[in-house]
């Protein structure tokens, strides 16, 4: 006869953890399911992703395709016109050194690019590595001298 206290949960939500190294009667004693010797028996061993046990791995069978120019792209630290307006005074020079002193650039890039966000009314001298079209238009309208350095 089946009673409520004798029912077993056939689909456990949490399986009991596998206790290894607890004697030969448990099926996971001595070598703990790792086999005898070799890398798999040692601690710290992890199978490499895509390893296929002697067979040529799939990623090596497939041909190389395409080309990515990402490793050659030029990355710039960017600064906007409104940032120059807020920090620099009339007659000052905006260059890599002055921007680094004020904490605007990190230095792990190919230079500085000036973007056209905001307006510039102060007469400053600008020496940067690249300028966007909108920034170039605003600088010529404001009659601010700028130079693109290499």
UniProtKB/Swiss-Prot annotation:
GO terms for molecular function: rRNA binding; structural constituent of ribosome. InterPro entries: Ribosomal_uL15, Ribosomal_uL15/eL18, Ribosomal_uL15/eL18_sf, Ribosomal_uL15_bac-type. One of its GO terms (biological process) is translation. Keywords: Ribonucleoprotein, Ribosomal protein, RNA-binding, rRNA-binding. GO terms for cellular component: large ribosomal subunit. Belongs to the universal ribosomal protein uL15 family. Binds to the 23S rRNA. This is Large ribosomal subunit protein uL15. It comes from Protochlamydia amoebophila (strain UWE25). The lineage of its organism: Bacteria, Pseudomonadati, Chlamydiota, Chlamydiia, Parachlamydiales.
